[in-house]
From Swiss-Prot:
It comes from the Bacteria. This is tRNA modification GTPase MnmE. The keyword RNA-binding does not apply. Binds 1 potassium ion per subunit. Homodimer. Heterotetramer of two MnmE and two MnmG subunits. HAMAP family: GTPase_MnmE. Pfam families: MMR_HSR1 (PF01926), MnmE_helical (PF12631), TrmE_N (PF10396). Its EC number is 3.6.-.-. GTP binds at residues 225-230, 244-250, 269-272. GO terms for biological process: tRNA methylation; tRNA wobble uridine modification.
Amino acid sequence: MREPIVAIATPYGESAIGIVRLSGKGVLDLVKKFFKTKREIKPRYAHFGVLYDDKGEELDEGVLIYYKAPHSYTGEDMVELNLHGNPRILKRALELFVNAGARLAEPGEFTKRAFLNGKLDLTQAEAVAELISAKTELARKVALKQLHGELSKHIRPLRETLLELLAYVEADIEFAEEDIPTLTKEQVIQMVDKVIEGINELLKTAKTGKFIREGVKLAIVGRPNVGKSSLFNALLKEERAIVTDIAGTTRDFIEETLQIKGVPVRLVDTAGIRETKDLVERIGVERSKQKVKEADLILFVIDASQEITEEDLRIYEEIKEKDHIVVANKVDLGIRANLEKFKGEKIVKVSALKGTGLEELSEEILKKVGANLEESVNIYISVRHETLLKKAKEVLERFKEEFREKDISPEIAMLDLREASDYLGEILGEITTEDLLGKIFSTFCIGK
């Protein structure tokens, strides 16, 4: 069991309860020096008592819960001390335990110990951080599934298939003279193809994961006075942007966040894109163009009550290669625009003023970012997972080509299969380095 660590596990500030958490060798004896109860402390019981300082003066009263190894979050002996949530009390308790021999925990160190002690694999440990930082109900649901091992269930069988292949290759080398069962070339290719197929399915979730974690960057773009700011306000359901009939009212971008059926969206209302001699407006137009480049999805807004202009078509040419939705606004005034100019496009007709068509627009946004996320998402991969999966796939594609065309030696086959297996093992934390663990757990809050 490792040295004792201690941290305040609740957010800083005044509250009804504040928790001081300890884990490691001898933590119960350490805490008992200062926390006195009338009864013997038993694991998993709540014990009321008094916390005294190092001079024997009463500091606070509270409740102690002891978790005996290995039946704890970290897999070590743990103590959680529930005190009144006064920052001064919690800080003083922290000082007491540090002076008595505990070390201040590093960010994420409790979860790191849980991983090192086999209580969680690395994808589950990462899910703890995702769960704590979840900004939407959908993000919370998916993080909880991954904490329960949902992602691991998809990756571990792929690695086991590669390890099974490795075992056959090693047996072929070690017992070449003996009559043992071997796989045909076709069987090997089939097994590798099965792993590649599984990797491809996981890679499809990378974009979804990015959207759930960071939000979809959604830019509203169009010429001046087509109702971009009105649409911005309608989607936000509040009057955030100034709306007038004067072209060029919005001179700089405005950015807000909202949720569309559980998906976080970073919505940007851009300045109307046009040629202008006004210096301030020109700067706003350039900044708007930068936001267009950064956007995951563009809402290209036209005024359905007017003819399509050359300015509309010029902006459309600039954005049509990016993911976009054509939004015909102001349909409540009648449709005079020749929408055939956008032949082949799915055009969503809305009235930002009346609120019509907004539900259809929301559905179209979800389709563009990857499907109805609220119902279908069980797992998603992070950038770290995506990088390792792509590396594993690259190695397996190379192996398959060489195995089929060049009839590579068993020794070379072993190297490729081992490398691909190790990449998958790194996702699960079965292959790790201290640098990797330090990088992952440093993003956690202290006390978790």
